[in-house]
Swiss-Prot record:
The lineage of its organism: Eukaryota, Metazoa, Ecdysozoa, Arthropoda, Chelicerata. It is found in: Secreted. It comes from the Eukaryota. Residues 1-22 form the signal peptide. Gene3D superfamilies: Knottin, scorpion toxin-like. This is Toxin-like peptide AaF1CA1. GO terms for cellular component: extracellular region.
Amino acid sequence: MMKLVLFSVIVILFSLIGSIHGADVPGNYPLRPFRYRYGCAVPGDSDYCVRVCRKHGVRYGYCWFFTCWCEYLEDKNIKI
């Protein structure tokens, strides 16, 4: 029983450390003309969003809440 409690505490601590120092990558939503966002269908990895993000000058993007999100996209580059 003590091993289970100790294991649980260790897992929780590593989870907290991961959320504190996790990969909180900056980014932005790329915009079309007239400030519309690029929509996408399935959340997660998306070839469409990667292509959109490459048009905006960054290497990687994915679908988040049915909208493309580009990692490391700066505010000045959000519009084409």
